[in-house]
Amino acid sequence: MRKRFICEKRRGEIWRNALFSLLLSAKRDLMSIPSLFNCSNDMALAAHVRQYVPPKRIQQMEADLADLARVWEGTRFAGPWGWSLATKQRYRQMGVAGELLPSDEWLEEVRRLSSREFACRYVKELLGELKDERLLGEEMRWVDKQSPLWDALTTSKPTWGTSVDRRGARRQTDVGHVDFGAVKTSRARIFKSPWSSSGRGVFVGSVDFNPNLNSNPNPNLDPNLDLNCKSSTLKRLQGFLSSQGGFVVDRFYEDKVLDFAMEFVVHKDHTVEFLGYSVFQTGESGAYGYNYVESQEELLRRIDVDAALLHRLIAYHKEHLAQTVYHGPVGIDMLKTADGSIHPCLEINLRLNMGILALLLFEQYGSGATVALTPVREHGFQALVEDGRLMILSEK
């Protein structure tokens, strides 16, 4: 009798445990991570700390544009704008269960894959495999502390050359004797820190280096102008090297006619889905302007690139994204020049981006709607769709 009672008791415990596990599983399925517009995430990746505090201007942007998260809330992209250690910590402080959050190891790999260093190596491999003369990027190079450039920046005597300011104006300045190897010295260059977004951490730098000139060829040049320019070039590059471990240098594409991107999502089973194209506008410094909210047919008309080449690039990106540990939204920024050439990968955004938002907004509202996505503010930031464009307005 006692044995039978014990068996029935154990059977009851098994059923209760099974029911509890089933209910817990169902609860986890119903739970989701709150959507969050944390546009400072790229800076948080650079800082690589759990307690990251963005600059006040960026804090204001995130607060003013918080309602943007409603665009992807309830979709398969529900969650943060981007992942980092700081994002994970923020969710912990919000009370999100640890089992719903990614591991630190996964976040470390996402940080590496999000770096422009990775994009630089990715482009080199892409060009070597596809071998298409219409593809640009052969001058895109990564420079770190192991590069001879590090010594050149810190020990070499100044050399006179030419710099290009953000307006594209050339001026003579002390730029430092720096050897960029295969990068042609007759062209302007754009310098980028490993992690940044919307034009931050990006500037146009010096050209026309002449190692044989070690004195000022123009004695009438204002020495203060020289000092400022040297600071804005060499010291910024030294800052990139010391704070983020390096920087990317590439040709400055003065003949650029279009910014566009390919948007993907990597599923947890590592299948990759091409979501579509996005077309956007940036300022000369790389700052975000707007995205077109239009049909794919209209966006392809704007891009106007050989379809076969685009399909080859899509296939390449899908194959290589599937080989990473990452899962989630991806945007690969590209550009087109006046002769029809395209840069296949300026950077890889392993996060939500304005291009994917534009795709979602087209699905929700079409191309002709005027929509205030965030509250109208007398001072601060506002997001809206107007005249077929997704824009972020700023009033200081």
What function would you assign to each model-found segment?
Residues L23-L24, P158, R167-R171, H177:
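Compositionally biased, intrinsically disordered low-complexity segments enriched in Pro/Arg/Gln/His
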Residues D29, D165, D174, D179, ...:
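Intrinsic-disorder-associated, low-complexity terminal segments enriched in Asp/Asn/His/Tyr and depleted
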Residues D29, D42, I58-T159, V164-R166, ...:
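Conserved N-proximal alpha/beta basic substrate-recognition cap immediately N-terminal to
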Residues K184-G205, Q238-D255, I332, E347:
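ATP-grasp fold ATP-binding core
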Residues A188-F209, D226-K230, D259-A261, E284-L300:
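Glycine-rich phosphate-binding loop of ATP-grasp-fold ATP-dependent ligases
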Residues S231-G286, L335-P344, N353:
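Phosphate-binding site of ATP-dependent enzymes
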Residues S242-F252, S285-G340, T374, E378-G388, ...:
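A long amphipathic alpha-helix within ATP-dependent nucleotide-binding catalytic cores
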Residues F264-Y316, N349-P375:
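ATP-dependent carboxylate/phosphate-activation module, predominantly the ATP-grasp catalytic core
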